[in-house]
């Protein structure tokens, strides 16, 4: 009896690089060259948008988990179009009363295409200087016994 192990090289190309990012109060799993419908963004078509709230980033063999965000990670998106979602009907009624209310809602959406997922230094360190403040300690006062 022979032991044959199946190789794990049959994984798809899309699982090599992905990121989980936060936008519009939701978390999305972003992959390069895919499009996503997110809540309406204030941008025109063909505009470039950069998401910096990256929660997790996986690149081939390494996984970076943010606390809460991954440092210097960016996702670059391109706005493809603006559209509206399907209509949702809401019907309210009170039984045994003549109160009925039928309302509808269509969510405004923006379709975006993921152009790139990068991690690296975005700004030089000189722009984000931290000032060091020295604490002055008071000497302990000696109690005199008179």
UniProtKB/Swiss-Prot annotation:
Biased composition (Basic and acidic residues): 128-146
GO MF: rRNA binding; structural constituent of ribosome
Keywords attached to this entry: Ribonucleoprotein, Ribosomal protein, RNA-binding, rRNA-binding
GO CC aspect terms: cytoplasm; ribonucleoprotein complex; ribosome
Transmembrane segments: none
Family, as annotated: Belongs to the bacterial ribosomal protein bL21 family.
HAMAP family, per the entry: Ribosomal_bL21 (MF_01363)
NCBIfam families: L21
Official protein name in the record: Large ribosomal subunit protein bL21
Organism: Prochlorococcus marinus (strain MIT 9301)
């Amino acid at each position: 009896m022979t032991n044959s192990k199946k190789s794990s090289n049959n994984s798809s190309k899309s699982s090599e690089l992905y990121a989980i990012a936060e936008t519009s109060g939701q978390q999305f799993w972003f992959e390069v060259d895919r499009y996503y419908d997110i809540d309406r963004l204030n941008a025109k078509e063909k505009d470039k948008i950069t998401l910096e709230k990256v929660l997790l980033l996986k690149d081939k063999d390494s996984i970076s988990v943010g606390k809460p965000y991954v440092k210097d990670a960016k996702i670059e998106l391109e706005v493809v179009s603006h559209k509206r979602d399907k209509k949702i009907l809401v019907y309210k009624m009170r039984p045994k009363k003549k109160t009925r209310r039928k309302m509808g809602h269509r969510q405004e959406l923006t379709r975006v295409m993921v152009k790139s997922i990068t991690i690296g230094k975005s700004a030089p360190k000189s722009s984000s200087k931290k000032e060091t403040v020295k604490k002055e300690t008071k000497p302990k006062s000696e109690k005199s016994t008179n």
